[in-house]
From Swiss-Prot:
Gene3D superfamilies: 3.30.420.40. It comes from Aeropyrum pernix (strain ATCC 700893 / DSM 11879 / JCM 9820 / NBRC 100138 / K1). Signal peptide: none annotated. This is Glucokinase. SUPFAM superfamilies: Actin-like ATPase domain (SSF53067). InterPro entries: ATPase_NBD, ROK. It comes from the Archaea. The keyword Oxidoreductase does not apply. Mg(2+) is the most effective ion. It can be partially replaced with Co(2+), Mn(2+), Ni(2+), Cu(2+) or Ca(2+). Keywords: ATP-binding, Carbohydrate metabolism, Glucose metabolism, Kinase, Magnesium, Nucleotide-binding, Transferase. Its EC number is 2.7.1.2.
């Protein structure tokens, strides 16, 4: 079976892998420099590091942060990188001149990967949610991958989950968005906002949040893991916002299952999943109960999604 080069362009990491028959044979990663020129250098370096004969690759799949201009294969206006436009299709065609290149939003590609290869493979109606630097989603309905007119039918991180949110704007400019509360880059800010109304014990994390000294989502989860009451309050709020988002997804797409991945969720799923499921019971009526499942491929969810869109092109997905 022919090999596929699978590329995962995330906000923090860029991964490239050689995948054959659904099995990753080799993989490398580098930090995303956040610029178009820097990304091209990183991709070239990854290809060289993997020993890929770039002139002989038949298929390339790329799972990318968005928003996308899917018809051109460009990243346009992403709040998570510096360059306003990244001509990803152009970069990949330069690097792999004889290849057929497929590009999709990372969460959309992951949904297709789960549908073709994951533990719920063949389930005709499923959703995939990534909780990582940001929050995104992808959906298969009736066995078809939903794309939207520009490839952005899946930007569920910008669902409003708190109309009274006073924590500042999302990276896109909106307020009260799921991503602005539960996205990894915003969790430190979420802790600071919640600290202003906290009436419980003055814990270490509470004092750090009140003074704006929480530097990462990891600090919040680590404090919660050792029983910091305020940290547990923050995690519960993040889970509640996420449950509201998932309930909205259920109402909009009528999927039978939602698969959750992304580093924020996967690294903390033992803490987050039971809280999300508990809050879902309040936000979704009994008749709309939804199965919540952990992602099948861990950190390689984007890579396997990239492989899937190249291996079996979804209907209406442009090929470059």
């Amino acid at each position: 079976m022919a090999e596929v080069v699978a590329v995962d362009v995330g906000a923090t990491w860029v991964r490239m892998a050689i995948v054959r028959g659904g099995v990753i044979e080799a993989i490398k990663r580098e930090r995303n420099p956040g610029t178009e020129e820097g990304l091209e250098r990183v991709l070239q370096g990854l290809a060289e590091g993997l020993g890929i004969d770039r002139g002989r690759v038949e298929k390339v799949g790329a799972a990318s942060i968005g928003p996308l201009d899917l018809r051109r294969g460009y990243i346009v206006g992403s709040p998570n990188i510096k360059s306003h436009i990244v001509r990803l299709s152009t970069i990949l065609k330069r690097l792999f001149p004889k290849s057929k290149v497929a590009i999709a939003n990372d969460a959309v590609a992951a949904a297709w990967g789960e549908y073709l290869l994951g533990r719920l493979a063949g389930t005709p109606d499923l959703g995939y949610i990534t909780m990582s630097t940001g929050v995104g989603g992808g959906f298969v309905v009736g066995g078809r991958l939903l794309l939207g007119s520009r490839g952005n039918a899946h930007e569920v991180g910008h669902i409003v989950v708190d109309m009274g949110w006073e924590g500042g704007r999302c990276g896109c400019g909106g307020t009260g968005h799921w991503e602005a509360i539960a996205g990894g880059r915003w969790i430190p800010r979420t802790s600071s906002v919640l600290a202003r109304g906290w009436r419980g014990p003055e814990t270490s994390l509470y004092r750090a949040a009140l003074e704006g000294r929480v530097g990462s989502a990891r600090e919040v989860f680590e404090a919660a893991a050792v029983g910091d009451d305020f940290a547990l309050h923050v995690i519960d709020y993040i889970a509640r916002a996420s449950a509201a988002g998932i309930a909205s997804v259920k109402a909009a797409y009528d999927v039978d299952a939602v698969i959750i991945g992304g580093s924020v969720y996967l690294n903390n799923r033992r803490m987050l999943r039971p809280l999300i499921e508990r809050h879902l019971a309040a936000y979704a009526p009994f008749s709309s109960r939804i199965e919540v499942v952990d992602a099948s491929f861990g950190d390689n969810e984007g890579v396997m999604g990239a492989y899937a869109i190249a291996y079996r092109n979804p209907e209406d997905l442009p090929i470059f």
